[in-house]
A protein has these predicted regions:
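Phosphate- and other anionic-substrate recognition elements at nucleic-acid/protein interfaces
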Residues: 1-200, 227-229
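Compositionally biased, low-complexity flexible segments
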Residues: 201-227
Length: 229
């Protein structure tokens, strides 16, 4: 059966699920995936804020390279396991916004404000997931977390209460923890299988590229992680 992966990233890790194309069939797998290898810090931009420019750039580069490597290894293991069990992994959804602070600002400006520090770290761990999934040939759909409830209602054709009940029930076989992170990741996976609601809300900019629905430019190129000017 076709399945999709769903992720809700945080600094250094992500909640991950694998979901059947038919949501009534439940969540196949729930796990926490590591997106950072030690010793590089899991919050490299925060750590770099107090360093001189050369040291800051080196730290961010080291942590970025480690994060891309960790994400690639984790997703490869997860996909291999699902495929070995007879599942066809066809897409991935990431519950994360489309910000581009890391691409748009030089490192010194990112490090100058608390808001851009947080934004850059969120984008880093989103980007490594998008890149790792793309490297495995999976089209990726980005789902802004604030839009998860509305998109879930539209996709499933249910009201808020029914959506919450369904998401709770889907996680019941796995037991606790089954948190909002896991539910957001589940919705992201379902939207990866049917991204039309995401495209409709986002407008023409969200139209699928040749690489697949919701893919960001450059995704899947682990040899070229985003670098600051």
């Amino acid at each position: 059966m076709k399945v999709a992966l769903g992720f809700r990233p945080h600094s250094g890790w992500a909640a991950a699920v694998a979901v059947h194309a038919d949501p009534t069939q439940g969540v196949l797998e729930r796990r926490r995936v590591a997106l950072a290898d030690l010793p590089p810090p899991v919050q490299p931009y925060h750590e770099a804020a107090g360093l001189d420019p050369g040291e800051a750039a080196a730290l961010v580069e080291q942590a970025t390279t480690a994060a891309y490597g960790a994400a690639g290894a984790e997703l490869s293991t997860l996909v291999d396991r699902l495929r070995a069990a007879g599942h066809e992994v066809v897409a991935a959804g990431v519950a994360a916004g489309p910000g581009t602070v890391r691409e748009d600002l030089p490192l010194d400006r990112v490090l100058a404000a608390h808001g851009t520090l947080h934004a850059a770290e969120g984008e880093l761990y989103r980007d490594v997931l998008v890149d790792a999934a793309g490297g495995l040939g999976l089209p990726v759909t980005l789902v802004p977390p604030r839009e998860v409830p509305a998109l879930a209602r539209q996709l499933l054709g249910l009201d808020d209460g029914s959506v919450r009940a369904l998401l709770t029930e889907l996680g019941r076989p796995h037991g606790p923890p089954w948190t909002r992170d896991h539910k957001d990741a589940t919705v992201a996976a379902l939207l990866a299988l049917d991204p039309q609601p995401v495209r409709a809300r986002a407008g023409p900019a969200a139209a699928p590229s040749a690489a697949g629905p919701g893919r960001r430019p450059g995704a899947g190129r682990r040899s070229r992680p985003a670098r600051h000017r």
